[in-house]
């Protein structure tokens, strides 16, 4: 009621509500900080350590998460990063928080004194104690694979002065005596090291260590004890049955070696009290559990890698394995390590050979008594890489593979089949030949290793005219029927025998596997006449289909990549190939020398081998230190050059060329008198800002043979193709952007009539460095 008794209604005319002010809501800004902490941890966990430090500097909350949560550091990636005085604190912090990669790299860095410079005084003792600490950390963090750190400290040990390997061994042993927990795997590693000595007393100590390790639950030690006691147990039926039960228990717990031994033991199932059906089921479970891993994924990760490049790399590794007489198992494991690494981490093409030879160094140490030493591995690459390069990539491989080196291979399943089924020796060799050919072709990886081994045996029996190539017994043992294996057999035959092998840039077919099985120990099985595709289809009872054309590129598309480390096996002819993309490759020069060049280079070849040796304890014997190293005559060549043939500075050369007679012919691995004439120096423009100092023990030389003659040189030039003797001195070398080279050569003396000289491999005197991409040539 208003004034004067007038009643006002609340209509729009009589009464007005105050207008509401509409406040515009600001949109909420969502940032990464708005995410829950659990989500932030998942984001931070898989970043590289450099990215983690960058994120840490963004906000105080992120700084708090990085500084106070161990999971961030435990999962940080240290890929392509090596311990140095500048980042040592980061590596140590990550290792203490549970980072496997950081612990492995620190252990290797201290063991080989690589990257973490320590004074020469008491170097081995100081580094050995530090290396043992981080190796112990790495082994405690290694939960998914067999103990592995023993492969780095296994003998041979240095006999002159203190040995870092021995210091690590003694330190780990002292740690096990003081520490009561988490030492089963360390004890196993110590036992593996002592078991490699010839001393009977040390072998007894190794047996005691295995017993203690097995008592604490180490499955690998339990199997080694079973293997050592097997001969004694087999003499008594009761003990034999008890031993078989233990083996079955180890196999059920996941020990791969025990599973293989159990399958092979089924050949004598009646002695073990097993029925034939039970034995077949046990073996069948092993074969059916085999899983295929498609290696074609490699090429989705490695954009610059082709199937032919991988083929050439594996072909070279086969030549090395043949030259060093390594087993097929060692070769298969090496290739598997290469492929697994290529699926996980990006590798530039010029490092493919380094990756391959490093995998072979690791695998020989893990499964063989005779090893490929680091210094010899460097020599096999013609010193294209330095000792330090190989040490570092070993750390990258172990980190990427998480310490898991031993995995099922085609060879394992083949050995089981040849144990269970009577097969003629020539058929066994043919089956082994086929299994080794499978390494070259990634397209065959769509089949599981067990299926490939079964198909190889079936194809071998078909080629040798067996009336029943696949019996009911084989069907029961493998679980694969005749029709199951037919597609795999056809693919195997097509890839191995129908398709042409790829050729290198010299138009030479890459046939290292074939040459490997031309040996008399394999009864020259690779020279046997092969069943034609039509005959195979008829034998299999399938309709013949026209095979697809070869998948390898034509010769014009193949880059210069690899050549043989064993020149005695094939005479490969050089030619002026026209190729591009030079900057992506590193070269291993292979050329013959004139007698003047031999006189100049003779002593330097052996001197450079000693200089790249690195760790003195990492050698096969004392004789190797004096130059007793197998010298390859032709190696990896990954340079791609695309030039006009008239302007190319490399003329044709071959093993058939005639050279002047030289009675004092130097051989790699033997000392030759130094040249009386002054040594011509290469033209090198190194980066003065680059830190090229490398650490190492007293036997490690951080400088190349050339840099020792010219103290003003810095940098590690990447080598290119070496000129053939006889190229014109006025010919200009080929240049690539961001790369400089200079070359002066003079024509050789005229050859004497009718005189032939053994070709000698030209030593690559320059060393490889990732940061420095300059090219250097010898001025002869």
UniProtKB/Swiss-Prot annotation:
The processes (GO biological process) annotated in the record are: cell division; G1/S transition of mitotic cell cycle; negative regulation of centrosome duplication; placenta development; protein ubiquitination; re-entry into mitotic cell cycle; regulation of cell cycle; SCF-dependent proteasomal ubiquitin-dependent protein catabolic process
Where does the record place the Cyclin N-terminal domain? 288-405
Which residues lie within the region annotated Disordered? 544-594, 651-733, 745-780
**What PTMs does it carry?**
Degraded when the spindle assembly checkpoint is activated during the G2-M transition. Degradation is not dependent on the proteasome or ubiquitin and depends on the C-terminal PEST sequence. Phosphorylated just before cells enter into mitosis.
Q: Where is this region: PEST?
A: 582-761
Signal peptide span: none
- Name one molecular function that GO assigns to this entry: anaphase-promoting complex binding
Residue positions of motif Nuclear localization signal 2 = 568-574
About its domains, the entry says: The nuclear localization signals mediate the localization to the nucleus and are required for CCNB1 localization to the nucleus.
Chain coiled-coil ranges: none
Q: Which GO terms describe its cellular component?
A: centriole; cyclin-dependent protein kinase holoenzyme complex; cytoplasm; microtubule organizing center; nucleus; perinuclear region of cytoplasm; SCF ubiquitin ligase complex
Q: Residue numbers of motif D box 1?
A: 310-313
For this protein, the record's InterPro entries field holds:
Cyclin, Cyclin-like_dom, Cyclin-like_sf, Cyclin_C-dom, Cyclin_N, Cyclins_cyclin-box, F-box-like_dom_sf, F-box_dom
UniProt biased composition (Low complexity) = 695-708, 719-731
* SMART domains (UniProt xref): CYCLIN, Cyclin_C, FBOX
UniProt biased composition (Polar residues): 585-594
**Designated name of the protein:** Cyclin-F
Q: Which residues form the F-box domain?
A: 29-76
Similarity field: Belongs to the cyclin family. Cyclin AB subfamily.
Pfam families linked to this entry: Cyclin_C, Cyclin_N, F-box-like
Task: Give the subcellular location.
Answer: Nucleus; Cytoplasm, Perinuclear region; Cytoplasm, Cytoskeleton, Microtubule organizing center, Centrosome, Centriole
